[in-house]
Amino acid sequence: MSTFRIALATTVMLAAMYGCATSELTNTWKDPKYGGGPVKKVMVVGISKQASVRRTFEDTFAEMLRAKGVEAVPSYTVVPEEGQMTEDKLRAAVKQSGADAVLITRMVEKQTDTQVSAPPPPIGAYRRTSYSGYYSSAWAGYYEPVTVQEFHYVVTETTLFVAEHPEPVWSGTTRTMESNDIRAATEGFAKPMIAAMKKEKLI
């Protein structure tokens, strides 16, 4: 499983992606050469510098996999140390857990969408009118400033490795809105991932 080096080369903080459960599966890929059936047990690995984030992510993702009939184990239950694991330690952890597959999630990039809301131009108040008419036209001409809203998203990549296969067998990319509710965001993020892997008969 030498390709773990690619997935583990960048230690990033998954904390940035977690928040509300707004998540979109934007792309998937499957190795056309892979002919194996569904995996039996998955080790879930979240790449994060924050131990609490990693644990919540791995726990939630593993729970959702188990809810779909897939045996899963969070990596921190085997390797509780914080920070990046060596490749040897990761391979030993996979063997110790009895998993035949590893699911690794990493952050790829942050994106910002900007939404500008421009109100209609104000209507000038009429000079030659009664006070009540002037009052009404004044409301019609009430000025609202242009509003600018920014929506922050994080793009993450989840890759499935099968222990006896030399290369990744599947990968999916999601775009998730930032927030602070780690568990809820992980649930929203994991749901389309699990559905896509089930569709491909990988889990």
Residue positions per predicted region:
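Surface-exposed short loop/turn segments
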Residues: 85-160
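Bacterial N-terminal signal peptides that target proteins for export
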Residues: 1-8
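C-terminal/domain-edge helix-coil "capping" segments
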Residues: 20-41, 49, 143-203
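N-terminal segment of the mature soluble domain
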Residues: 41-115
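Short low-complexity stretches enriched in small and charged residues
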Residues: 27-31, 56-67, 126-129, 202-203
